[in-house]
Structures are given as structure tokens and as C-alpha cells.
Amino acid sequence: MADQQTLDSSTPPPTQSDDLSHSHSTSSTTSASSSSDPSLLRSLSLSRLNAGAPEFVPGRTTPPLPQPPRMIIPPPPPHGMLHMYHHQPPFNTPVLGPVPIQPHLVPVQNHHPHHRFHQHHHHNRHQNQQYVPVRNHGEYQQRGGVGGEQEPDLVSKKNDRRDHSKRESKNDQVTETGASVSIDSKTGLPEDSIQKIVNQVEYYFSDLNLATTDHLMRFICKDPEGYVPIHVVASFKKIKAVINNNSQLAAVLQNSAKLFVSEDGKKVRRISPITESAIEELQSRIIVAENLPEDHCYQNLMKIFSTVGSVKNIRTCQPQNNGSGAPPAARSAAKSDGTLFSNKVHAFVEYEIVELAERAVTELSEAGNWRSGLKVRLMLKHQTKEPKQGQGRGRKGHDADVEHEEDDATTSEQQPIEKQSDDCSGEWDTHMQEQPIGEDQGNEKAAGQRKGRNRGRGKGRGRGQPHQNQNQNNNHSHNQNHNHNGRGNHHHHHHHQVGTQPSNNPMNNMEQPGMGKQQPPGPRMPDGTRGFSMGRGKPVMVQAE
């Protein structure tokens, strides 16, 4: 080993000059060979740049890429065959999901299935159109051979599809026509609309509606047979929205089993007549409930009021607008009575017997929560308590008045404003004559002013309330200063006509102011000319300002 290391160390390493001489000799040899083979010039230049790099030898040979298949243009179709093109859709057909492209697929324009056979005809019009690869495009050629021979079958199939769609649409129309309600030949209305109208008018003539409203009862009481003019029923909002004229409504109501239409078609009445005694008996079993809960549907109200006993009917009424057509006298009396122009949702509940209604008033009324608690009262009690206080009014007229008030508070759609104003004004004109005037006063002018005040306000109602009004009837009282007793007796004569006893003794008149203690609570309204009313049962002291 020592000898070998000595020999290796004694052998001089190759110097740089030897490498250069070797490369020069190699390059000279290469140049000689390159001059003979010109294709080796490129490899010679690369060998100069990196002479020390090993030569790259590929491990396998890459086969040449196959050329794409050539498209064979078929011959044009014969002259006797008409070639039809499909219209281009307004938008390109979207591609839902990726479609793998295989080498045998040909990109074809999406609007025509045989576009590759006729691309030379109109390729200039669709240069910017989107091309979608179509799978199994050769299926058309396999079925029909040449693309032009398949067109008649496609056209016939398209026509068959159109005919089928037309038949389906026609069948749908027939089905819809068959499902619709048939039209009545007499009235010209659908049968379902006729039944709705009949049910609505029967409800208007029902016992509960007649007992809680007075609009139809006034017409029933006026007619000896209990007829109501057909135009009155046709004026209701729900009927007016469906009916065109009165004769059409008369024809519709002939289908009712509870109503009878006159021969001329101008009047309608109940088949089973209703009497005043039946109305009073029904009203005694009805309670009026106010301050209802927020969710006052029929089911919830039935749960509340059925805890007392069996409930037959419940009728919920919306609040009445304050600006209805009643005169100021009727509105002020309504506030004192508590039955007119309710500004809250209220309900009429009909029980089986009177005892259940009285029990409901006792158990369901929330007296502790007077602001928002449930308020329950008897309907008939409010109608009969005021004649017991000696107001000098007949029972029949008072019942009609209270029923009229309930009608205003509940069913505003059944009470025209003009009729309501006329009836209220007529009733309050009658009440004006009932105001007892004839107190022993030294100032006849004040007595005449009280008379004018009572006529304008309509608030007397037999209470004997003294009032002040020094801006009315000044000339009338000045000319009648010498006829005090005669004027007083004249007014007592009017009281005798409406059912009260005449009073000629001034001492009897002095006892009447004591009745002011029974008037309903709450402030009285101002007269609008001098200020607020004073006294409330005390002797009036006229003060000069």
C-alpha cells in the first residue's frame, strides 16, 4: 500500500494547459466532422456552452400525435326535399354541470342538432355564438342516415306535440268550466252567491238581530203584515256589493225558506211573524258585554260566557264612530245612558233563560277594574229603568228609542245617517214638551230663557232641571210678563197629554228639583252661550254680570 501511494503521489496531476490542449484537439476533431455533417452545427454550439455536461439520451420515443379526423361533407339534399331550419332561441342553452369531452365528440352549435352537416351554409352568422359539446351526436345519423333525410320525421313529431298540447289546454279549460258554479237563469248570479245573499238577509230578519237593532223593526211595526221594502234591504253594504237592482234581489230571496216576497217583488217579510212580546222576552235573556279581551274571537267569548250557563248566540259589534249623523241632543243623552255610540268593541250574548243572564252580570262583571275590566249588563234593564223614575214617557216609545240607540251602537251599516238624524230629532222634539216649567220665580225672563234652553238642548227628560240661558227668547219673555200663570198652566196641559199629572200648585213644582239627585254621574255639557249649567236641583240665582 505504501508503494502504491508513493506511485500515486509521484504521478503529477494534469495541469490546466493539458486540459486546454485536449479540448482544442477535441474541438478540432469535432469541427472537422461538423464540416462534413451540417446537422451537427447546433449540437456543436451547445457543446461549447456546456462542454462538461453529459449528453441527454431519451429513455423512450414519443409517438407522433394523431391527426384530427377529417370532416366529410355530405352531398346536398335532393331538389324535391325542403330543408327546414330551427329558429335560434333568444338565449343560449345553459350547460348544467361539467360535460366530459371525448376525442370522438364534435363541438356543435346548440340550436340545431345537425349543424355539423350544414355548417358551411350559415357559419358566418354564428361566429360569436357559444358552442356546446353534444353527446351521442352520431345517433341522428344512425337513425336516418343522412341528416337531411331525418327532417320530415322531426317536423311531424313537432306537429304532434303541438296538437297534444292544444288538446291538453282544451281539456284544462273544460275542466275549469265544469268545476265552476253554474249560473242561475233567473237572477244571472252564481249559485254560491245566491246562497250567501239568502243567508245574509235571513240573518237580518233573525230574532237576535231584530232584538238588538231597531232599523228593520220600525218598518215591520209600520206595516200591518210585517213587510219591509225591498229597497231598504238592498241598501245594506253587503247586499249592495253583489246585487245590481231590486228586482234581482227579489228573485234571489224567493229561494229562501224563512222569507216571503210579495207578488210585485217590492216587499219582503218573515214567514213566521215576530211580536213585541217575543222581542221583550228575548231581550231579557241578552246581556251586553264591553271591554272585551284583545282576542275576542267567537271561540274565546264562548269559553268566557259559557262558564255561567248555556249560550245560544254571540254577536260581536265594532265600535261606532263618534261623528255619525245623530243630533247633539241624541249624543248627549247617549253619554248619560251609556248605551249609545260605544267607542269600544262590545258583544251581545243570548242565554237560554233569564236567570243565566242575571247570573252572568253578577259573576262576570269586574267591578274592581273599572277602566279595563269586563263590563256586563242586562239589555232589558237599561231599557226599562228610566220609565220607573217618572220621566213621563210611554213604554213603547221608550223601547223603540233604546232599540234605536242599540242599533246605532252596533250595526252602523244597517242605519242610514239621514234616517237616524230624522228619527232622533223627532223623538227629542217630543221630549221637549215634557220638561216641567212653571216654578214660582219672580223673573219671568229667566223662565222664558229656561224654556228656550230646554228646546235647544233636549236634556230635560222630565228631571225638572233648572238652566240658564239669557241670550234666547228675550222679546218673548218681555211681552209675556203679565201672563205667568197662564203660560205655566199651558205647559202643564202638555204634560197631561203625554201621561203625567197636571200640576197647578206651585208647591208641587218646588218638589221637583229634588229629582236631580238621580241623574247619571258625570259633568253636564255647556250651553255654548253663557257657560256651564248651575244648580243641579238648587234654586237658580240669576246673577248680573
UniProtKB/Swiss-Prot annotation:
Domain HTH La-type RNA-binding: start-end pairs: 187-278
Ranges of biased composition (kind: Basic and acidic residues): 154-173
Residue ranges of the region described as Disordered: 1-76, 105-187, 382-545
Compartments, record wording: Nucleus
Residue ranges, compositional bias (Polar residues): 1-10, 174-185, 498-509
Domain RRM span(s) in chain numbering: 285-383
Gene Ontology cellular component annotations, sorted alphabetically: nucleus; ribonucleoprotein complex
Keyword hit for Transcription: yes
MF (Gene Ontology): mRNA binding
Compositional bias annotation for Basic residues: 111-126, 448-464, 479-497
Function: Transcriptional regulator.
Protein name: La-related protein 6B
